[in-house]
């Protein structure tokens, strides 16, 4: 039977390698159980063909609200093993950066809400993430200061002549 990708389109997940297996409605949130699987790549170390090994423990990835409830994706990623050099590798997806658990769409939403006048705790509560994640994202911003010229008006609080 051909798989229809209604749920992945609804959640705006563009990776065709992510298969949604089940959706569980909890009292406080929705859990989307999915797996990331694709053909084994060649080994980055020795270049020989890797083989499918097993799946990782599910990553708990927070995601945007669906139907007014916070949701998270329990993503099981495929692991690959090179039997020539014993190198292990985990499947990657554009949904999240390598070795991260916060998806790119949540990072974009954090940046969007930081521009608005909303407190960090409210942002964290709305997106179902921790406040420290919002603070880390704020610290990622780089503000450019123009020190090439002085302002027209300058003032000092205290001064002393010695």
Could you describe each region identified by the protein language model?
Residues 60-162:
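Short, positively charged, Gly/Tyr-enriched micro-motifs
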Residues 1-87, 93:
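Short, conserved DNA-binding cores of transcription-related domains
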């Amino acid at each position: 039977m051909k798989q229809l990708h209604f749920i992945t389109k609804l959640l705006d997940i563009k990776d065709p390698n992510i298969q949604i297996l089940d959706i569980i409605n909890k009292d406080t949130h929705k859990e989307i159980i999915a797996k990331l699987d694709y053909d084994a790549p060649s080994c980055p170390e020795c270049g020989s063909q890797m083989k499918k090994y097993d799946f990782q423990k599910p990553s708990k990835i927070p995601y945007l609200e669906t139907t007014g409830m916070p949701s998270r994706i329990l993503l099981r990623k495929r692991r690959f093993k090179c039997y020539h050099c014993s190198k292990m590798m985990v499947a990657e997806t554009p949904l999240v950066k390598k070795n991260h658990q916060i998806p790119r769409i949540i990072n974009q939403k954090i940046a969007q809400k930081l521009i608005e006048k909303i407190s960090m705790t409210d942002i964290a509560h709305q997106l179902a993430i921790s406040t420290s994640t919002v603070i880390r994202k704020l610290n990622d911003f780089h503000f450019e200061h123009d020190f090439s010229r002085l302002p027209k008006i300058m003032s000092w609080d205290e001064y002393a002549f010695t």
